[in-house]
């Protein structure tokens, strides 16, 4: 009889602890919350942040909230994106206790926690979960993206430019799936034709997959940027420490453009593109190196290399590329837009894009890569 009583008490304690941790995350606005507390007191959590600007800001808030809801045992947290596991964070009981007793700061917690891109074991534990709280499925976000392009043929004369606002409706469907519908509103440009018109932007359905062992996949179909419509498949592998990522992408598209004569014109000529990619991250200096070898839409082959320095939410980098006998280069940067947190109710949000990304391309020896 006493054995059954102990089992019942442990089960009730586990349910209570699981509910407390989940409630803390739900109060922050986290979505797709899954929690499992084992008999030994260890707790595994999965959550998705669609509230805070920047992944790491939301993760930090979630870590603090989860530790406040803990009453013993180790903590394992899986960060989701479109319900697909991306990152695993581990904290031992000693660190959690010292933080709650104010013996160490949150900064010291960050330095002692474990971070891995290997989420397989944690997701195996979460298969025992009973339900998912605050699901993102069916929620709609209206996101306004600024678009700016400057392209020069010489260093002293502006050649072409445009400034657009491109609001998009983004809706989470089922696990890994998202529907996007975007309209582009021109603000200023010295280009002609469709660039002066209100026109469709990205209208696409994407499906992501987590294949385990560090492999992730994505399939996207619809209307893309650069006047292309079709489908694209991508596969990538990343190591557990996140320092190396290898990938491949292939697609087939036709031309999709807004014309004066025919309206929205869609061609029948299918063009193929493909690329092999590699990315290396150096955490000591927050440097990211990217290399890509590709076959482009019109049959030419080329290589491109990027070097990007990350400063928290800011990033700036340079790139160089060689294709079809021509050498080109330029720089790019990303800065956060105002607003660190958005209010998201059951229906969704209306917000500005989290980052403003921009690049300027200069043609070496007067050559421009289109």
Predicted regions and their residues:
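Flexible, glycine-rich linker and terminal segments associated
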Residues: 79-128, 283-290, 296-299, 310-317, ...
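Outer-membrane beta-barrel initiation region
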Residues: 20-204, 267
